[in-house]
Amino acid sequence: MAGGRYVEAVSEAEFRLGAGECLVLVGESGCGKSVLASALLGLLPGNAETAGSALLPDGLDLLAADEDTLARTVRGRRVALVPQSPAAHLTPVRTVRSHLEETVRELTGSRTPRAAAEAAAARAAFPASHLDHHPHQLSGGLAQRAATALALVGDAPLLLADEPTTGLDRDLVERTADELRAHTRDSGRALLMITHDLAAARRIADTVAVMYAGRIVELAAAEAFFGEPGPRHPYARGLLAALPERAFTPIPGAPPELGDLPPGCAFAPRCALADATCRTVRPRLTEGVACHRA
């Protein structure tokens, strides 16, 4: 930050994600979700520092890998990204087919990329009749499918989907969630989806990780989180209570600045259950929850 201050944008983020599984990372904007995804792909700003490890099944540590390794062997090949606002990531003067064929050439070295590009489009349910369209000719749903097709070209075993349903109509949200889930279930890929849309999370997740102020404060099976017994952390309970089909009760207050976190639980100033311990002692993630009162 300006003035030479350091900010822990993400800390104590620990989870496992297996083949064929979907973990959804939820939380308010600015809590560190996208920073975590950027760290896994080595896309943080040059002045950012990382610590810890992020291990792929073959033992490669994504946080320790150099740029050459990430560029040649990871991005698109072992870890693929479905970006937020996909239309903004497509070059406006090029067709969808051109984007796909270039990606095929880059990732596979093929000199005849047409068939592979069309196969990736088919897997993403992108219509062949629209392959020669430019980005401005695509609806939000088709732009999302184009981005998904680009992510599927390299057959990466891990997909990162960063807010893939943002800006979509509800029916497109449900369709996008279902399609991403199918890519995971049918191919054995792992999916890490980042979202603040709890309805989409409920539709797709095997596991839910709740982030607050840069930390994972709850990690739970989706069935238990959205059903019974429900969330254990007060912040996670507040997220569900704010849903329109539930109490529609907003969480009071606002998240703290990451550069000015309180000494204890970061949620304590907004929590009706907080006591002196909560305000002074930072809780650790234990048995799936980081809360003194859970």
Where are these regions (language model features)?
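ABC transporter nucleotide-binding domains
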Residues: 1-230
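Short catalytic/signature loops enriched in Gly
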Residues: 219-294
